[in-house]
Every structure is written in C-alpha cells, then in structure tokens.
C-alpha cells in the first residue's frame, strides 16, 4: 500500500500507481498487480484514528505541512497510549516530525507530549535526546570535514578532538550524495 500526503489535495492523478509509469502495460506485467494508493489528505481524522498501528503515521503524514502540530497532540496522545507504540515507531514519528515539520517548535511539541503522557516521559525524552545527539554529532562531523577540505592540519584536528586515526580516516571519506546538502531546506 502506498500513502500520498503531498501538498496538492486531493491527489489529482490516478490512484493506481501503475498508471504513473511511462508504460503502464509493461509495469502491470512486471509488478503482477497494482497495490492501492491511499490519499491520506482526504481521509477524515476520525477514520484515520481507527486504523490502529498505521494511524500515527497516517495522521502525521496528513498534517505535517501544517506549521503547528500542537493541535494534533490530543489525538497523538490517545494513539500513543492506546496503541502501545514501541520505541522504533516513536523514534520514526519524532524523526519525521523533526525532519519534515516545524523544527522551531519541536522542543515545545516534545514538552507538551511528555506533559500529557507522564508515564512515557522518560522514554520520549530519551528518544528525543538521542535524535538531538545524532544531529549534533553529524553537525560536528560536517564541520570537521569542512575544516579538512579547506586545508586545516589533520594532526591539529586529531589533537584537539581526541579522534582516533580510524575516525580521522572516516572524516576524509566523501559523504554520500544524499547527505552532502541535507542541511539545506528545499
């Protein structure tokens, strides 16, 4: 099943994903059958919350382009409490909100979520902190790479950072294309 949550709503094209191929007939032969494309932008929230395990994802995908997700807190709390989302799902949810939503209000969002779910406060804060730390580490690595690329002395960098020879070697490797400009907003 494919989910659409683009900015145009409702989805303006065919809901059969095979029709999106340049040659739909060949696509049908290759993939045997079409699986449905669900336009979550037109599904009512009341219906989405009935979708159990995928409800969290669908609800966030539908509303992520709103710059203020605080209005969804009530529904998210109900889903998180009743569906017993695991750490992996909560991590994916928080990552998605942080990367796609309004980063400026992420901390406020986390604070309100934990205020309403005190029994899960430690778990949510641990996950949010881990996401924050991962971003911090990637930022440090990006700065160190830029220093190296712009002629900074590798021995000096190693001395002040305490990095091992292996870690320094990893910094000299080019970033994968998808990560090179990930900090730029489109």
From Swiss-Prot:
Pfam families: Transposase_31. It comes from the Bacteria. GO terms for biological process: DNA recombination. GO terms for molecular function: double-stranded DNA endonuclease activity. NCBIfam families: T_den_put_tspse. Belongs to the Rpn/YhgA-like nuclease family. This pseudogene is the C-terminal fragment of low activity DNA endonuclease RpnD which probably yields 3'-hydroxyl ends. The intact protein can be seen in this entry (AC B7NGZ6). Expression of the repaired protein increases the frequency of recA-independent recombination, but also decreases viability probably via DNA damage; in a RecA strain expression has no effect on viability but does induce the SOS repair response. May play a role in horizontal gene transfer. This is Putative inactive recombination-promoting nuclease-like protein YjiQ. The lineage of its organism: Bacteria, Pseudomonadati, Pseudomonadota, Gammaproteobacteria, Enterobacterales. The gene is yjiQ.
């Amino acid at each position: 099943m494919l989910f659409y949550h683009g900015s145009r709503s409702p989805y303006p094209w065919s809901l059969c994903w095979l029709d999106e191929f340049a040659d739909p007939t060949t696509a049908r032969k290759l993939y045997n059958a079409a699986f449905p494309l669900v336009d979550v932008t037109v599904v009512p929230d009341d219906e989405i919350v009935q979708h159990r395990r995928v409800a969290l994802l669908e609800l966030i995908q539908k509303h992520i382009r709103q710059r203020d997700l605080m209005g969804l807190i009530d529904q998210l709390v109900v889903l998180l409490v009743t569906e017993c989302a695991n750490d992996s799902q909560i991590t994916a949810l928080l990552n998605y909100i942080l990367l796609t939503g309004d980063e400026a209000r992420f901390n406020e969002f986390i604070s309100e979520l934990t205020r309403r779910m005190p029994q899960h406060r430690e778990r949510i804060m641990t996950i949010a902190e881990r996401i924050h730390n991962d971003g911090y580490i990637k930022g440090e690595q990006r700065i160190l790479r830029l220093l190296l690329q712009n002629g900074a002395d590798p021995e000096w960098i190693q001395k002040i950072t305490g990095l091992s020879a292996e870690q320094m070697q990893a910094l000299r490797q080019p970033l994968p294309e998808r990560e090179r400009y990930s900090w730029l907003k489109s």
